[in-house]
Amino acid sequence: MACSAQHVANKVLSSYQWRLATKKYDPTKNVSDEDLDAILEAGRLAPSSYGLEPWRFLVVNLRDNQASEQSLCLKEKLYEPCYGARASLNGAHYLVILLARKNVNAESAYVKHMMHDIKQLPADFEPTYAAAFKNFQENMFDLAGNERATFDWACKQTYIALSNMLTMAAMIGVDSCPIEGFNREAVDKILEEEGLLDGGQYNDFGVSCMLSLGYRDMDPVQKRRQPAEDVIVRL
């Protein structure tokens, strides 16, 4: 029997009530491959400005008896500059590092690749699409010529993917924690040394945010949010 819209809404809201920023994970409990794939797929399917998907997700296995040599190396190297991830590194099963592309603009090879190869736009429409994106960057969001602002715009897109992954994780009972507590310059250097920021023929990457996944080893905490009337303004 098909679920009613209200039933689905209640399940989603119940999952949000259950979810918390997990500060302590149980190192003996692992996320199944199926659940991990579902979470990552939710991120991959996230919407993005102009549909440009300016992201990449690095999946670091934190289990010493499962992880690749590179994952174990990253686990060790990231501990010092990622003060907000240390509890996760000590117990979570996975750390997902969300990268954002740098210098994405209408003339970049990456945008042309997305238009032609991924979106498969008609050839006569590609100039119109590129012109619209250029106008957006130059005249609407004042991004043109500002590398940091353009990178921050790309980072904003990764947070949409992050939100999708957080929601999927909560819906299937996997605990998570979004992470911004890290030294961006130091993490970029580590990832660059590992060859993980190289965009190949397209734009290179920089770190945006992180997400840990596993199962909590902590008591539930009361969710505290501002009252709806202080947040929602119905016009």
Regions found by a protein language model. Give the residues of each.
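Acidic, surface-exposed loops and disordered segments
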Residues: 2-235
